[in-house]
């Protein structure tokens, strides 16, 4: 992603020296294959200075003076688009929220509905969740080929920073329990959010999450009721045909979660686990690196949004 110029980072809770160390050494991904160091005002990555800010009010950030075009809002505090618009007040042109959002102009899942993005009217964009990015490409293929009547999903998801490392208080009593010691059932809006990118599936999908004691890689276990009878072979053939190898991938290898660490696809269908019951009930398993896969789509979306904004501006000027 050399086409993207990284201008600044705003994090009130992180100092440059801490950021440089965490960037350089990752417990899951290993050591960064490049150079990173801190300086007084930020960090230097591969010789490029990236300035740091610690501003709690995004509207006060110097985005206009710095020529910032696209802000990736990843704090988790500004998932309401009305609050995220503070970045636009500060001078940015577009905001991408790296989470499910409310009041956003559009939710985009690459490989599913990115063609609906209109730079003239979509200024605050949600990227949904990593789980929605895994499920939606699968649902798109299955619905187009066979028709989805309804479905239930379980995401078997690696634990996240919103869980407690040891038993401690949390508004969700299950997430209050030690994440590395328990299977933790919890809610997810990922299934329902598919309807934001595939409107024909509104009200047809639901599900929940099972957080498990692994640091990275998750899977979606989804059961669809279809509008026609199918076989395992037909379902796998449709998924194999629909897999572009970039967003949606297909495998017949008997792999486990650690094999998917560092994979950049949003969704990798495990064809060996596809099942059909009663003709029109199908179970599909698809893996995803919930860190690398989502981060890759986020960078690609940032590039797409920036490029289309620039093209739209040039067209307007001409």
Predicted regions and their residues:
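Short beta-strand/turn micro-motifs at beta-sheet edges
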Residues: 111-114, 207-212, 269-274
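Internal helix-turn-beta structural module
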Residues: 261-299
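A common structural junction motif
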Residues: 239-248, 305-307
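Active-site-lining helix/loop region of Rossmann-like oxidoreductase modules
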Residues: 4-5, 16-17, 31, 137-242
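Conserved small/polar residues in nucleotide/adenosyl-binding loops
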Residues: 308-315
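Short proline/glycine- and acidic-rich turn/helix-capping motifs at secondary-structure junctions
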Residues: 250-266
């Amino acid at each position: 992603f050399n086409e993207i110029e990284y201008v600044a980072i705003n994090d009130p809770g992180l100092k440059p020296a801490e950021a440089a160390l965490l960037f350089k050494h990752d417990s899951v991904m290993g050591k960064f294959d490049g150079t990173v160091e801190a300086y007084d005002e930020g960090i230097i990555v591969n010789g490029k200075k990236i300035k740091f800010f610690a501003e709690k009010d995004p509207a006060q950030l110097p985005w206009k003076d710095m020529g910032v075009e696209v802000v990736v809002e990843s704090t988790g505090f500004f998932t309401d688009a009305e609050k995220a618009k503070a970045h636009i007040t500060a001078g940015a042109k577009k905001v991408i929220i790296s989470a499910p959002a409310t009041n956003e102009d559009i939710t985009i899942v690459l490989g599913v509905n990115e063609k609906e993005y209109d730079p003239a009217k979509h200024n605050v964009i949600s990227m949904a969740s990593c789980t929605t990015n895994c499920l939606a490409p699968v649902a798109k293929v299955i619905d187009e080929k066979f028709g989805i009547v309804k479905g239930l999903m379980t995401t078997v998801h690696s634990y996240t920073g919103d869980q407690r490392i040891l038993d401690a208080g949390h508004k969700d009593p299950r997430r209050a329990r030690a994440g590395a010691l328990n299977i933790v059932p919890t809610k997810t809006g990922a299934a329902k959010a598919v309807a934001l990118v595939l409107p024909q599936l509104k009200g047809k999908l639901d599900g929940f999450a099972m957080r498990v004691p692994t640091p990275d890689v998750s899977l979606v276990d989804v059961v669809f009721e279809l509008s026609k009878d199918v076989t395992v072979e037909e379902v796998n053939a449709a998924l194999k045909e629909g897999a572009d190898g970039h967003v949606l991938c297909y495998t017949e290898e008997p792999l486990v979660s650690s094999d998917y660490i560092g994979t950049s696809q949003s969704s990798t269908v495990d064809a060996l686990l596809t099942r059909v019951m009663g003709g029109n009930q199908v179970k599909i398993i698809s893996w995803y690196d919930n860190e690398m896969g989502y981060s890759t789509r986020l960078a690609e979306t940032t590039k797409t949004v920036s490029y289309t904004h620039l093209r739209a501006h040039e067209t307007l000027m001409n």
